[in-house]
Swiss-Prot record:
Source species taxonomy: Bacteria, Pseudomonadati, Bdellovibrionota, Bdellovibrionia, Bdellovibrionales
Record keywords: Cytoplasm, Ribosome biogenesis
Protein name (Swiss-Prot/TrEMBL): Ribosome maturation factor RimP
UniProt source species: Bdellovibrio bacteriovorus (strain ATCC 15356 / DSM 50701 / NCIMB 9529 / HD100)
InterPro entries to which the protein is assigned, alphabetical: Ribosome_maturation_RimP, RimP_C, RimP_C_sf, RimP_N, RimP_N_sf
Matching Pfam families: DUF150_C, RimP_N
Cellular component per GO, a single term: cytosol
Amino acid sequence: MSESPSWMAKVEKIANDVAAAQGCVLYDIEFVGLGKGRTLRLFIDREEEGAISIEDCTNVSRGLSEILDADEEMIPGGEYNLEVSTPGLDRHLKKPWHFKKAIGKKVYIKTTKALESVGVEDKKWKNAKTVEEVLESADEQGVRFVVKDVEIKIPYAMIDRAKLVFEYTKGQKK
């Protein structure tokens, strides 16, 4: 991950506080675009299980807008749009707590090196740089999958990108 500008770190701290005041947690923040198309995007979630409502997004947006609009110098470069939403069904996983929340769900991970570099010897997996399987566990060091008796441990430092995989399951007819 790249270093954020210092103003972005300030905005992230404020966004964390505003989200917490609404009973939410800041899942991720990004600033994208150029000129009048610049957008500050916040993704909020619950630390534990539970859904984020439109009202939660609205309250966080209003609370943050109030603070940012009071100090026009906080975000350099003039106009920007503010978007507040949930991370979505196929959310990106970046922080250890994101992975912990995804335990028992299917995730996609792209690594920076082949899996043999972390001790995977299985013929099918040792040269792989991607895994799309159900996440068995996650801790502060990395993640763990077990696929047909093959254990795959991947440290966070080796993860290039990761996301939750949405699996559509068709409902049963009654």
